[in-house]
Swiss-Prot record:
Catalyzed chemical reaction(s): [HPr protein]-L-serine + ATP = [HPr protein]-O-phospho-L-serine + ADP + H(+); [HPr protein]-O-phospho-L-serine + phosphate + H(+) = [HPr protein]-L-serine + diphosphate
Extra remark beyond the main annotation: Both phosphorylation and phosphorolysis are carried out by the same active site and suggest a common mechanism for both reactions.
PANTHER family cross-referenced by the UniProt entry: HPR KINASE_PHOSPHORYLASE, PROTEIN YJDM-RELATED
Active-site positions on this chain: H141, K162, D180 (proton acceptor), R246
Organism: Pediococcus pentosaceus (strain ATCC 25745 / CCUG 21536 / LMG 10740 / 183-1w)
Protein name, per record: HPr kinase/phosphorylase
One Gene Ontology term from the biological process aspect of the record: regulation of carbohydrate metabolic process
Cofactor field: Mg(2+)
């Protein structure tokens, strides 16, 4: 997990306006992705107050404080909410900011940020950004491409031809996300995201050629910054004694964080066109996800044939 996201980065990415605390933005860190909307705190119940979270004020919170609380109550409550660990107060919808909230923020060095977005949309935008930035990360060796809209992670031993295969797939119109090193993180309970380290973004290394800039050579449509990893294609040197799945009914997976990602192992030997094979494997994987499994159709037809022959 990242050490924290500066409030300055949050302001830049979510396009927030700074009402107070420009000088505090770099030093204030957000360490959790959850956003708090004050509820019971406005009634002076602070037993479970999440002081380490961003505090988001929408129309409900601002209206309640204005209509149901006295000036002294607002001063007391807001001052308790402005904890030293609180990253920021955020006010949505361009709502007027209570004077007591401004004073509490100044007294306790808590930035005040504003946005014209509706509260629910602003909450979603901030949560999604923070979940991505604060997620646990890992790096793996391989190529990540988007093939027919699916994120395909190509793995295999060094020198087996992963980069050359990636180049072939790029020339066929597919997109490169990462070459050689892929940074991965779990976005949510069902999604694994892969991206390239910033210094390697859009670059591809080919032995004997060197490093090429894919975006400059093939255009912006040939690259993408990140994608969801849907399937792993593992390239393995051909071994006549090794067992390879011939029917496609053997399910393999590889575990990352809390997720098991489907895996397809492809034997590699001279004369096999890996670009064609990986395209076919990706299309077949997509077809299975849409409910059509060629292996099951073959099994059904075979069983029917055996049944018919046994009745003769």
């Amino acid at each position: 997990m990242a050490d924290g996201v500066s409030v300055s980065e949050l302001v830049e990415k979510i396009r927030l306006d700074v009402f107070y605390g420009d000088e505090l933005l770099e030093q204030k860190k957000v360490t959790v992705s959850d956003i708090s909307r004050p509820g019971l705190e406005l009634t002076n119940y602070f037993k479970f107050y999440p002081h380490e979270r961003i505090q988001l004020f929408g129309e409900t919170e601002i209206s309640y404080a204005k209509d149901s609380m006295t000036k002294d109550e607002r001063t007391k409550i807001y001052d308790r909410m402005a904890d030293v660990d609180t990253p920021a107060f955020v006010v949505s919808r361009g709502l007027p900011i209570p004077e007591e909230l401004i004073q509490a923020a100044k007294n306790n060095q808590v930035p005040i940020l504003t946005s014209t977005l509706p509260t629910s949309r602003l909450l979603s935008n901030m949560t999604n950004f923070l979940e991505d930035r604060l997620a646990e990360r890992d790096s793996i060796h391989g190529e990540l491409l988007e093939i027919y809209g699916l994120g395909v992670l190509i793995t295999g031993d060094s020198g087996i031809g992963k980069s050359e295969t990636a180049l072939d797939l790029i020339k066929r119109g597919h997109r490169l996300i990462a070459d050689d090193r892929v940074d991965i993180y779990q976005q949510d309970e069902q999604t694994l995201i892969g991206e390239a380290p910033r210094i390697l973004r859009h670059l591809l290394e080919i032995r004997g050629v060197g490093i090429i800039d894919v975006m400059n050579l093939f255009g912006a449509s040939a690259v993408k910054n990140h994608t969801e990893i849907s399937v792993i294609v593992h390239l393995q040197n051909w071994d006549k004694d090794a067992h390879f799945d011939r029917l496609g009914n053997g399910e393999q997976t590889r575990h990352f964080f809390e997720l098991d990602i489907p895996k397809i192992t492809i034997p590699v030997r001279v004369g096999r066109n890996l670009g064609d094979i990986i395209e076919a494997a990706t299309m077949n994987f997509r077809a299975k996800n849409m409910g059509y499994d060629a292996t099951k159709v073959f099994d059904r037809n075979l069983n029917e044939l055996i049944k018919d022959n046994s009745q003769k």
